[in-house]
Amino acid sequence: MRIKTALLLTVLVAVGCVNNRKAEQFSALPFPDVKAPSMIQDQQQIAEYLVEHWWDGLTDPQRNYPCDSTLVSGVSKGDVEQKFANWTVLLGAVDYKVAVKSVNRLFDRVVACEKKDTASNVFEEMSAIMEKYLYDPNSPMRNEDFYGPYVARLSQCEFVDEGMRQAHAFDARMCTL
């Protein structure tokens, strides 16, 4: 009986080690940085292009990436947050209408990711990062003018449960004060 138990434990440990090795082999993908077309030379136009297309690679609904709770569309959450911080700096450097258009475009793209695959965490993670950076009172990047359009759309989004929609509607109203 002891031999059978020892053999069973050995097999379980071996299988566990093989599975751990497979998990260790995966590494996060780099953030898909956007580059302005070379024909755009004006610095303001470059900033506008970048702010509008910043998230295209990450939020492409056709993008295939490994599903992992530590990643957003295959990119580490830390990298996504750093790129979000960089993007918010660019938002402040462009005209307000361009910034709002970019925020709305991001919302449309994360919703498209959610429609394609509800198991994807892109919608949830990007919405959480948006709130953390642009609405948290302790965030040095807090900007209700940029958060307002996003949260207003969250308040009407089919992928948000009714209770949270009401909370988002309240936040959207607070952003307009």
Regions found by a protein language model. Name each.
Residues V18-L177:
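Oxidative protein folding and maturation machinery
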Residues A14-G16:
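C-terminal motif of bacterial Sec signal peptides marking the signal peptidase cleavage site
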Residues R2-L8:
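Sec-dependent signal peptide recognition
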